[in-house]
Swiss-Prot record:
Taxonomic source organism: Mus musculus (Mouse)
Name by which UniProt lists this protein: SH3 domain-containing kinase-binding protein 1
Chain intervals for the UniProt region annotation (Disordered): 221-242, 289-309, 372-485, 511-650
Name of the coding gene: Sh3kbp1
PTM comment: Monoubiquitinated by CBL and CBLB after EGF stimulation; probably on its C-terminus.
Summary of subunit composition and partner proteins: Can self-associate and form homotetramers. Interacts with CD2, F-actin capping protein, PIK3R3, GRB2, EGFR, MET, BLNK, MAP3K4, PDCD6IP, SPRY2, ARHGAP17, ARHGAP27, CRK, BCAR1, SOS1, ASAP1, ARAP3, HIP1R, SYNJ2, INPP5D and STAP1. Interacts with E3 ubiquitin-protein ligase CBL. Interacts with CBLB, but does not interact with CBLC. Two molecules of SH3KBP1 seem to bind through their respective SH3 1 domain to one molecule of CBLB. The interaction with CBL or CBLB and EGFR is increased upon EGF stimulation. The interaction with CBL is attenuated by PDCD6IP. Interacts (via SH3 domains) with ARAP1.
Domain SH3: from-to ranges: 1-58, 98-157, 311-372
Modification type Phosphothreonine: residues: T298
InterPro entries, A to Z: CIN85_SH3_1, CIN85_SH3_2, CIN85_SH3_3, Endophilin_SH3RF, SH3-like_dom_sf, SH3_domain
Composition bias, Basic and acidic residues: 399-434, 561-575
Length: 709
């Protein structure tokens, strides 16, 4: 039959449930899965949550029964007999009975509630049970109550056995049936109200001898005395079972009792005792002498043992916080001082300790062992939290029951994990590794700038500016767009190469060009003109476009330089500090130069002629370098509108030449570097292919070996 004691109140929510209160005992329990048990209380049977009660085990029942001393009635003593009844039994522990757990108070504690015990340092408490985490129930000086578990030190089994053996020695040292004066039965009264037992301490004789003494005194009283006339025989009678029946003494007219009036006109004296009685009843001095020394020497071994234990207790300090993953683990925070209980746990790498009244295991690499001379006495333990109010659990249970038809138990804690099996340890370790804190990670390194070559290759290029839209050009013939396309294609290629490889070149837009009202003069106006030669003009007619002189005549380097300086005259005038200009901008600037207003009708074809002029020198200079033209003049003999070019400094031209040469060098260097990198990548790729083939062969061999087995 299973029984359980109620630990928390619960109010029945349905008809088939039991209303239970703290302290009640539920009997005839039938355990069922799902968190609800069925039991009987006060004649009513119903369901109740299993986590609101604590099952009473057989061992606990025996302890409860052993605590109740057998109460037997005290028997009367015959009027003239100083012997005690053999049925008088003292409340002593049996020899074969083991004591319950005991603990010694390490810190004093004043009770905060009525059900708590007052603890003083050195008190010994008998533990009844662990009612709640951090709170135990025990007996101290006959009072049962609650006390905090972290204010005491539990005594081991050796000290309990020591106490039992000492009690056994005490019981052996005194005669059987020792009875203090406060527990004596009612004495027989003599004359003048004085008792026959006054001022004496008696002992119970052995059962066999007691029976003989009863028969002896009963025979003496039944036969009576000759001087007395034998009338006392009517006062006593002995039963068939040999035990003396204590009957009420009838008052007589005779003087005296038994042997006559022996106390007539004399003080009352006790009857002289026989030799057998003296042997059975030991003097008080002897018993006291044997009794006191063991009692005085008893606490010394336990105290010294406890002192040695407290001195050897180890402590450890938490250096990394850890959150408990299971119910039997401790949640530790950085800086906490944990009392170490056991280092040799079932699981390797885990220690058992106590913190704030709670015992559990924790990882040993999260703490640091403190030196043996560390003193924790100054750090008084904190009082554990009081027993949690059961209202929370009731609420958890009732709210869930309202929403569901079938009974669902209130939330109960998960079961403790079984660490005895070694195979469960690998599953535990990943959690530990995840939760284990480490030294703060080093911040990531700053991104290294890309390796620069010997020519100061830039690490990051600025974003390209959007190209300026070119206005529509009016072409007089179909050949002029071809020339413009050739020039624009060349400028686009050069612009792409330069923008990808250099950020030292300043990107100047056309927005920075400031128009000037001054008339510009061409630098070659003062040169002598050759007759019969057509100079390159700013505006070309249809006849001039059709003539082959534009494409067949050689273009001198001086003319190329003059065209470049003419195209950049706006930039040189507006910004003297500008040092670099892209070739693509040179070609674009040439097309954007407005023609000088003239009186001729040919001015309408200005944009087309400008684009053709801009593209033709570039294309001709690439194809026929090193040949000179007969006439560098821009003025035609037919009186067409003339352009007066701006005067540019020779230093700007030299800078442009140097930049072009530098760009060519950069391009060649980049080509060589790219070739080397491609070769290196190809060689690494070949090595990786070889490694992969080798691994594939090894895998195939392993597969074959496994299949053959």
């Amino acid at each position: 039959m299973v029984e359980a004691i109620v630990e928390f109140d619960y109010q029945a929510q349905h008809d088939d449930e039991l209303t239970i209160s703290v302290g009640e005992v539920i009997t005839n329990i039938r355990k069922e899965d799902g968190g609800w048990w069925e039991g009987q209380i006060n004649g009513r049977r119903g369901l109740f949550p299993d986590n609101f009660v604590r099952e009473i085990k057989k061992d606990m029942k025996k302890d409860l029964l052993s605590n109740k001393a057998p109460e037997k009635p005290m028997h009367d003593v015959s009027s003239g007999n100083a012997l005690l009844s053999s049925e008088t039994i003292l409340r002593t522990n049996k020899r074969g009975e083991r004591r319950r757990r005991r603990c010694q108070v390490a810190f004093s504690y004043l009770p905060q509630n009525d059900d708590e015990l007052e603890l003083k340092v050195g008190d010994i408490i008998e533990v009844v049970g662990e009612v709640e985490e951090g709170w135990w129930e025990g007996v101290l000086n006959g009072k049962t109550g609650m006390f905090p578990s972290n204010f005491i030190k539990e005594l081991s089994g050796e000290s309990d056995e020591l106490g039992i053996s000492q009690d056994e020695q005490l019981s052996k040292s005194r005669p059987e049936g020792f009875l203090p004066a406060s527990l004596l039965p009612f004495p027989a009264h003599g004359a003048k109200g004085k008792t026959t037992f006054e001022g004496t301490i008696l002992y119970r004789a052995a059962p066999g001898k007691t029976e003989g003494h009863r028969r002896y005194y009963s025979l003496r009283e039944t036969t009576g005395s000759e001087s007395d006339g034998g009338d006392s025989s009517s006062t006593k009678s002995e039963g068939a079972n040999g035990t003396m029946a204590t009957a009420a003494i009838q008052p007589k007219k005779v003087k005296g009792v038994g042997f006559g009036d022996i106390f007539k006109d004399k003080p009352i004296k006790l009857r002289p005792r026989s030799i057998e009685v003296e042997n059975d009843f030991l003097p008080v001095e002897k018993t006291i002498g044997k009794k006191l020394p063991p009692a005085t020497s008893t606490p010394d071994p336990s105290k010294t043992e406890m002192d040695s234990r407290t001195k050897t207790k180890d402590y450890c300090k938490v250096i990394f916080p850890y959150e408990a993953q299971n119910d039997d683990e401790l949640t530790i925070k950085e800086g906490d001082i944990v009392t170490l209980i056991n280092k040799d746990c079932i699981d390797v790498g885990w220690w058992e300790g106590e913190l704030n009244g709670r015992r559990g295991v924790f990882p040993d690499n999260f703490v640091k062992l403190l030196p043996s001379d560390f003193d924790k006495e100054g750090n008084r333990p904190k009082k554990p939290p009081p027993p949690s109010a059961p209202v929370v659990k009731q609420g958890a249970g009732t709210t869930e029951r309202k929403h569901e038809i079938k009974k669902i138990p209130p939330e109960r804690p998960e079961t403790l994990p079984n660490r005895t099996e070694e195979k469960e340890r690998p599953e535990r370790e990943p959690k530990l590794d995840l939760q284990k804190p480490s030294v703060p990670a080093i911040p990531p390194k700053k991104p290294r700038p890309p390796k620069t070559n010997s020519l100061n290759r830039p690490g990051a290029l600025p974003p390209r500016r959007p190209e300026r839209p070119v206005g529509p050009l009016t072409h007089t013939r179909g050949d002029s767009p071809k020339i413009d396309l050739a020039g624009s294609a060349l400028s686009g290629i050069l612009d792409k190469d330069l923008s990808d490889r250099s950020n030292d070149i300043d990107l100047e837009g056309f927005d920075s060009v400031i128009s000037s009202t001054e008339k510009l003069s061409h630098p070659t106006t003062s040169r002598p003109k050759a007759t019969g030669r057509r100079p390159p003009s700013q505006s070309l007619t249809s006849s001039s476009l059709s003539s082959p002189d534009i494409f067949d005549s050689p273009s001198p380097e001086e003319d190329k330089e003059e065209h470049i300086s003419l195209a950049h005259r706006g930039i040189d005038v507006s910004k003297k500090t500008s040092k670099t200009v892209t070739i693509s901008q040179v070609s674009d600037n040439k097309t954007s130069l407005p023609p000088k207003p003239g009186t001729m009708a040919a001015a309408s074809s200005g944009p087309a002629s400008l684009s053709s002029v801009a593209s033709s020198p570039m294309s001709s200079s690439l194809g026929t370098a090193g040949q000179r033209a007969s006439s560098p003049s821009l003025f035609s003999t037919e009186g067409k509108p003339k352009m007066e070019p701006a005067v540019s400094s020779q230093a700007a031209i030299e800078e442009l030449k140097m930049q072009v040469r530098e760009l060519r060098t950069i391009i060649e260097t980049m080509k060589d570097q790219q070739k080397r990198e491609i070769k290196q990548l190809l060689s690494e790729l070949d090595e990786e292919k070889k490694i992969r083939l080798r691994l594939q062969m090894e895998v195939n061999d392993i597969k074959k070996a496994l299949q053959s087995k």
